[in-house]
Amino acid sequence: MAVILSLIKRITTIIIALALFSSCGKNTKESNSNEQKLSTNTETENSKTKKKVLFVLTSHEDLGDTGMKTGFWIEEFAAPYYLLKDKGIEITLASPKGGQPPIDPKSASPDFQTPATVRFNDDKETQEVLSRTIRLETANQADFDAVFYPGGHGVVWDLAEDENSIALIEDFYNNNKPVAAVCHAPAIFKNTKNTDGTSLVNGKKVTGFTNGEEEAVQLTSVVPFLVEEMLKSNGGIYTKKADWSPYAVEDGLLITGQNPASSEPVAELL
């Protein structure tokens, strides 16, 4: 009889132990599941709150009838790109034709190298991203918090007249999102309008590549129009600093920079 009672006690002890072990395992699984859900929710929230900026680059590579090549100016892309990227901002690159946008050969010369361009030259990942810009016609302002246009002479030929670019800029502006442009890129405001039909820069403080700077690079008679003159004729309150000095202007949702040296100040304002 004593043996039977002892055996019953042992069996009971084993059953209780197994029940406790099963309960602990269940709680552990639930805890792990909850942790995974929390991690997923956190990642989702971070994705929602992460700022997104659209960069729009020129696809035009012919410098008028000179037989020389143009495109976008490396510093005007690289300096803002890395400044924003290093702050955790997500950047998407677009161009009218998509794919690899042309780089102005002069901007790659040793005389125009900066820390940002040197970083770009060694950055194979960003070079690969740049080679796969999306077509501008597929870009939607609803997917971004702001839009930025790097300069380069190419802009005055294509983006200044591009219907998709014009509509996109107006869409950003009308949805209270910043529009930034540097050097020749303020050419994008040539045909942009307010809802009342007036020029988007009318009555706004703006800057851009100066007449003097264009004369210095001997392209006054080559470009289809002068950025400074266009901004003034469209009613912009145009201001500038000494040629080649860094200078950026912010007026409401519009942010503009005078020249390549103004690239980083424009990005800081953005």
Describe the function of each predicted region.
Residues 25-175, 187-270:
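Extended, subdomain-level signal for the structured scaffold at the beginning of enzyme domains
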Residues 1, 16-18, 145:
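Residue-level detector of intrinsically disordered, flexible termini
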Residues 176-180:
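Conserved, well-structured core segments that form or line functional sites
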